[in-house]
Swiss-Prot record:
InterPro entries referenced in this protein's UniProt entry, alphabetically: OSBP_sf, Oxysterol-bd
Entry-linked SUPFAM superfamilies: Oxysterol-binding protein-like
Organism: Dictyostelium discoideum (Social amoeba)
GO terms of biological process kind: defense response to Gram-positive bacterium; phospholipid transport
Coiled coil: 328-361
Keywords (A to Z) from UniProt: Coiled coil
Molecular function in Gene Ontology: phosphatidylinositol transfer activity; sterol binding
Gene3D superfamilies reported in the protein's UniProt record: 2.40.160.120, 3.30.70.3490
Name of the featured protein: Oxysterol-binding protein 8
GO cellular component term of the entry, any: endoplasmic reticulum tubular network
Length: 402
């Protein structure tokens, strides 16, 4: 979906806080030779394989967030989703959904891997401005699947991420299976979109850099209109890198708008005239933030304030399953690497022991907040069917009375 795949990929190769996944003339993207040798030794037996769940990585390459927390990071672009929902035109709704999907990839600056969620782990965000609420749950460990639902007065967004990664020697690819569902409450239109391929180049030799490529299709299943975005694969010497082009077409296949730009800079929208040519003027749908990032882990301010923050109020109302409360995450954020490594090991061993217990008792894992249901059109969907928010309200009331 999303930036989560980027951070997962970068975590497979990130080794220190100074590592930048970008081309560089001053070697700031390089890994130390001894670290590369160790990485090569670890990965050499996995060439051509899905390594998502095969490798146990040392704690020093992690960032102090769980992948469920990373799943929430697209909501820093909630304004684009709200703007999409408020459009009278289905084509302009598609345009802002396209901008949202481009914006996700603009934050590819972090080089560490998020922690793998524990089965049954949850994460919530209740927006401080009251614009939305977000809930995610890790519903499967093998394969690793996280699902989430975001609800606002304008839309409902359902996400599913099933990561698959393959190692090819000096590069590695991450693909995400799963369909994202967007429901526009103003028009009652139902949209879906897929994911891109993310490739990390020069894992062993050269300066690390990321590429995101493929076709991203956003479809309006109510009317049949769609936006088709083409993320260019970087060519020789970086030709075409970051480029995005696209078209928004109606149910008859006629082009109504064209999209162009770079996913790390800005996205422009051009209306198509009756003669098929593009308008000479454009609308800027989105422009990358130039806000400086000054913290150790390269978290944007929005992430610091909404994803990482664990204040006294949260401690009183969060369930024990929330990602913020993971002991390994907290220790890592505080710089206690030895404690973080120990707590990470304890969590993983507890998860293995729980699985052995279920196998011995012939029991299947039961999700708490989301259920996989049959869907005639999409095969299946993950629907929220828990009582998380009701229980949260009770915890809030209890905390207020103390």
């Amino acid at each position: 979906m999303f930036s989560g795949a980027l951070n997962y990929m970068k975590g497979l190769v990130g080794t220190n806080e100074n590592l930048q996944v970008e081309e560089s003339g001053d070697n700031k993207g390089d890994i130390e030779p001894e670290q590369r040798k160790g990485l090569l030794k670890q990965l050499s037996s996995y060439v051509g394989k899905d390594i998502t769940s095969l490798i146990s990585l040392p704690v020093w390459i992690f960032e102090p967030v769980s992948f469920l927390q990373v799943m929430s990071e697209p909501l820093q672009y909630n304004a684009l989703l709200s703007k999409a929902s408020k459009q009278d035109s289905e084509f302009l709704c598609l345009a802002y959904l396209a901008a949202f999907n481009c914006a996700l990839y603009s934050t590819a600056v972090r080089t560490r891997k998020p922690f793998n969620p524990i089965l049954g782990e949850t994460f919530e965000i209740v927006d401080k401005k009251g614009e939305f609420r977000f809930l995610a749950e890790q519903v499967s460990h093998h394969p690793p699947i996280g699902v989430s639902e975001t609800i606002s007065e304008d839309y409902t967004l359902q996400l599913e991420t099933l990561l698959k990664s393959k190692f090819y020697g000096n590069s590695s690819e991450v693909e995400i299976d799963g369909t994202n569902h967007f429901f526009n409450k103003k028009t009652n239109h139902h949209y879906t979109w897929n994911h891109l391929v993310t490739c990390c180049h020069n894992i062993i030799i050269g300066s690390l850099w990321l590429d995101h490529y493929g076709d991203l299709v956003i479809e309006n299943h109510t009317t049949g209109s769609k936006a088709v975005l083409k993320f260019a694969k970087s060519g020789w010497l970086g030709a075409g890198r970051y480029g995005v082009t696209g078209e928004i077409v109606d149910c008859e296949g006629d082009v109504r708008y064209r999209i162009t730009g770079k996913w790390n800079e800005s996205i422009q929208l051009f209306q198509v005239m009756d003669n098929g040519s593009s308008s000479t003027t454009s609308t800027c749908l989105w422009e990358a933030s130039k806000e400086p990032i000054n913290n150790k882990f390269l978290f944007p301010r929005w992430v610091e304030e909404n994803v990482i923050d664990l204040n006294d109020e949260y401690k009183k109302i969060l369930p024990v399953t929330d990602s913020r409360l993971r002991a390994d995450r907290i220790a890592l954020e505080e710089g206690n690497l030895d404690v973080a490594a120990k707590e990470k090991h304890n969590l993983e061993e507890k998860q293995r022991e729980d699985k052995r217990q279920r196998v011995a008792e012939n029991k299947e894992w039961e999700t708490a907040q989301f259920k996989k249901v049959d869907d005639a059109k999409f095969g299946y969907r993950w629907n929220y069917c828990g009582n998380y928010w009701e229980e949260r309200e009770e915890r809030v009331k209890a905390a207020a009375s103390n």
